[in-house]
Structure formats: C-alpha cells, structure tokens
A protein has these predicted regions:
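Conserved glycine-rich beta-strand-loop-beta hairpin in the small C-terminal domain of fold type I
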Residues: 159, 176-184, 196-209
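Conserved core segment of the aminotransferase class I/II
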Residues: 101-177, 186, 266
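Active-site phosphate-binding strand-loop segment of PLP-dependent enzymes
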Residues: 21-92
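Helix C-cap/helix->beta junction micro-motif
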Residues: 12, 73-74, 104, 226
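PLP-dependent enzyme catalytic core of the Aspartate aminotransferase-like
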Residues: 36-37, 104, 221-230, 236-266
Length: 266
C-alpha cells in the first residue's frame, strides 16, 4: 500500500514500485517475501511508513530487523518515515528503525517531525537522522538549499514541542484514546457492517465500507448523502477503494454526529 503523495518520486526520474502489506481481515503486516523480491529486482530505496498510515499498524522489531538484514544484503537504503511515532498509545511498542540493529544503522535514514503529534504542520520543519557514516556523509553532501525549506518559526516550535511538550502530548493521547474507543462503540452500535480495527497510534481510523454496497467509491457516496468527508481508500491504493480514512482527532460531539449522519444516509 502506498500513499499517492509519493508521486513526487517520479519527479526525481525514479520508478515507483508498490509492495503491498499482507492482509488478514484488518490486520496488516509487512510482506517480507515481497520485500525481498522487490529488493532482488533492483529496488534501491525503500520508503517505509513506520508506524503505518493509514492502516494503524506498528511494525514489529522482528520485521524491522529482517528488512534491515535484507537491505544490507541487496544494497538498499531504507527511509523510515516515523512522523506519527509520538502518538503511539500506551500498551503498544514503537521501535525506532535505527535502534534495531547495526544493519539498520548502516542502511537506514529516519525522517520525522513534530508536526503530526503537536499539530505544527503549517510551520514547516522536519528532521533527517541516520546512524551510519556512509549515509551521514551522503546527507551532509545535500545542497544547503534543502535546509532552507524549513522555516525559522517551525524550528523554534519543533524544539519547544519536543523539549517541553511531554505533558501536553500525554493529555492529547488520553483524549485520542477516548475518541478511538468512542468510535468503536458507535460503529458497533450504529454501523455494525463497517470494519474497524482500533489503531495502535494516532488519530486516523481505517474503515472498511465494502459490506454497505455504496458503489465504487463509498466515501464519495457518504459525502453526497450525509455530508461527511472521509479520505477515500483509493488515495492510498487502487485496491482499497472500498475503504476510508476517518479522522477522529476532534471532539466527541463531532465524531458522534459524523457516525449518525453515515448511519442515516444508508
């Protein structure tokens, strides 16, 4: 599964190769055989979404160790997008990719930002982190203009959030935890045919609308009938047009109204 925002890869003159996750119901995992097949075919860079948006899965230490081992074997650089990691719920373990092994440090680059966890996306600041000398030298050789794309306000805000924002983040996670469970209860009561696996992190729910028989694009139908805007699964993969990404990072009242509107529109 890929996010279509990654179409910028084509602007670099590179070929985008989609390596789907394995699916057992709404349980998604890395397909290690498919990953190795992709590496063997000549893939040079692996864009790893960790934890995974939109399906709500956190990759395990064992999975990360294996893809690091494969990446070193086949000469692949892994770019681990860990922007949602601070929003991991208590009881779930997030393991930073670079921490799993020496192989991961040799082949891996982590990209992250305070923007998702602390709601700072408009301030434009991100970080590139690596643990290996070869990749460190490659990053240091990047044009200075790359750094100019961050804003001064973004750098100041990110520093403040990451240094002093622990108590705020804990409160945010408590609210989001209540919201994800509220959504589960509402779906169970009013939309029992909709598939929903409670996410391990974040404020995004991956919903399966296939059983509702709402046509080729259920999210478009729900927008037209119920005036509820949900990201269509087709944004992430043409195979998932019957799915939608629901943002529950809002008030309980709005979540309840959204589910009520969906239920009334059926």
């Amino acid at each position: 599964m890929l996010f279509r925002s990654w179409n910028w890869v084509k602007e670099l003159g590179a070929e985008l190769v989609d390596i789907p996750l394995t699916e057992k119901g709404l349980d998604y995992r890395l397909d290690l055989d498919a990953v190795e097949s992709g590496y063997r075919s000549g893939v040079k860079v692996h864009l790893l979404c960790h934890p995974h948006n939109p399906v709500g899965t956190i990759h395990s230490r064992g999975e990360l160790e294996k893809i690091a081992e494969l990446a070193v074997k086949y000469g692949v650089t892994i770019i681990s997008d860990e922007i949602h990691a601070p929003l991991t719920y208590p009881g779930n373990e997030f393991v930073p990719f670079l921490s799993v092994s020496q192989a991961a440090r040799e082949c891996g680059v982590t990209v992250t930002s305070a923007s998702k966890a602390f709601n700072l996306a408009g301030l434009k600041c991100a970080m590139i982190i690596t643990g290996g000398e070869v990749l460190k030298n490659r990053i240091n050789a990047m044009p200075l203009s790359v750094g100019f794309r961050a804003s001064l306000f973004g750098a100041v805000a990110a520093t403040a959030a990451l240094r002093d924002g622990k108590s705020w983040l804990e409160g945010c996670l408590k609210t989001l935890d209540e919201n994800r469970n509220l959504l589960r209860n509402l779906i169970d009561a009013k939309l029992p045919a909709v598939g929903y696996r409670i996410p391990d992190f974040g404020y995004l729910a991956w919903l399966d609308f296939a059983a509702l028989n709402l046509g080729s694009d259920p999210c478009a139908t729900l927008l037209e009938r119920g005036k509820v805007a949900i990201n269509s699964g087709s944004m992430y993969s043409p195979r998932h047009s019957q799915f939608g990404r629901f943002n529950f990072g809002t008030s309980p009242e709005i979540i309840t109204e959204a589910v009520d509107r969906i239920a009334r529109s059926l």
